[in-house]
Swiss-Prot record:
The gene is s1pr3. It comes from the Eukaryota. The lineage of its organism: Eukaryota, Metazoa, Chordata, Craniata, Vertebrata. This is Sphingosine 1-phosphate receptor 3. GO terms for molecular function: sphingosine-1-phosphate receptor activity. GO terms for cellular component: plasma membrane. Pfam families: 7tm_1. SUPFAM superfamilies: Family A G protein-coupled receptor-like. It is found in: Cell membrane. It is a multi-pass membrane protein. Residues 315-384 are annotated as: Disordered. Residues 56-64, 127-144, 208-235, 293-384 are cytoplasmic. Disulfide bonds: none annotated.
Amino acid sequence: MMINPLIYLHYNYTGKLDHRPTVGTSPGTRDPKTIAFLVVCSFIILENLTVLLAIWKNHRFHNRMYFFIGNLALCDLLASVAYLVNLLLSGEKTLQLSPVLWFVREGSMFVTLGASIFSLLAIAIERHLTMIKMRPYDASKNYRVFLLIGTCWLVAVLLGALPILGWNCLGNLPDCSTILPLYTKKYVAFCIIVFIVLLLAMSVLYARIYILVKSSSQKVSKHRNSEHAMSLLRTVIIVVGVFIACWMPIFVLLLLDVACERPCPILYKADWFIAVAVLNSAMNPIIYTLASREMRRAFLGLVCGVCYRGNGSGNDSGNKQFQEPSRSRSKSWSSQTHPNQSQQSSRPAELDREQETGHGEISVVAGGAAQASQREGEGGNGGR
C-alpha cells in the first residue's frame, strides 16, 4: 500500500516521524517492546475472558454487582483488543491508513476508556441510590443495571466518535495534538477534563457510601459491621485507586500535550504511558480474585474443570470439589432476593456472605445497611 499523504503531513508536522523507532530491514519486523506489549495484551484478554465465563457459569453471581463487574471485565477485554489492534496497525502501517481507519483505531481506545470510567461511576450511582432509598436487593430491578450499562456504552461511543464526526484538526495543523496528530488539542483537553471530573465525582460518591454504611453498621454491631465497613472501604480504595494510579500518568501527559506550544520531548514517549494505563485491565481480575473468595473458587473450578475435561477423567469429582462448599452460601444469595423466606437464617447467611466475599460485599452492603433498623426490631422481638 502507498503512504497516505494526509497522515504523512500530520505526523511530519508534529515531529513524530523524526521520533519513530527504527524498523528492521525486513518488512513487518517488530521491535521487542511491541512484541512484549502484544503478549501482555493477549494475557489480559484471556484473564478478563475468564472473569466473564466465571460470572456467566455461576448463577450465584447473577446479581447487580456482578453484572457491573462483568461489564468492567468486558471493558478491560475490549480495551486490550483495541490496544492489540492499535499495535498491529502501528509502525510502518500507520502511514498507510486512511483518516477514517486512523480515527477508528484511536477512537476505540477512547471508547473503552470512557466505558470503564462511566461504568465505575454507574456502580457508585447505583449503590448510592440503593443506600438513599433504604431498600433491600430486588432481583426484579435488574433492568436498572442494564439501563445504566447501556447508557455508559452509548455515551462512551458518542464521545469516541466526535473526531470522526468532524471535531478534528484536519486542515488546521497548528491545533493538532503531538501524541494524536489528527486530534485537535481542544478535543483531547475536553475528554481529559471530563474523565477527571467523573473520577472526582466517583470518589465523592464512594466516600458518602462508606459514611452511610459505617453509620448504619454501628447501630447494629460495633465490632463485626465496623470490620465489614472497613473491608468495603479497602476494596473501594483498591479498585478506584488502581484505576487512578494507572490512568493518571497518561492523563497528565495529554494535558501537557495540550499546554505545550512546542512539542516536548517526553510526548514522544507516550507508548510507555499508554502501556501503564492498559495494565489496569490486567490488575482488575487480580483484585476480583484477591478480594472475593467466591471468585477464587469460581476461577479454580473453571480452570480445573478445563484440566479435568482435557484429561478425560475426574470431571465430576472436580466440579463437586468446588461446588459443594458454596451451596450453603448460595442460599444466602437467594435469601437476598426473597428476604421474607426463612427469616431466622437470614442473619447467619448474611454474616457468612460478608466474610466470604470481597466485591460481593459491595453488592450486599447496601441491602444489609438498609435493613439495619429492621434487624434491630427483629432482635428486640426475639428477646421478648
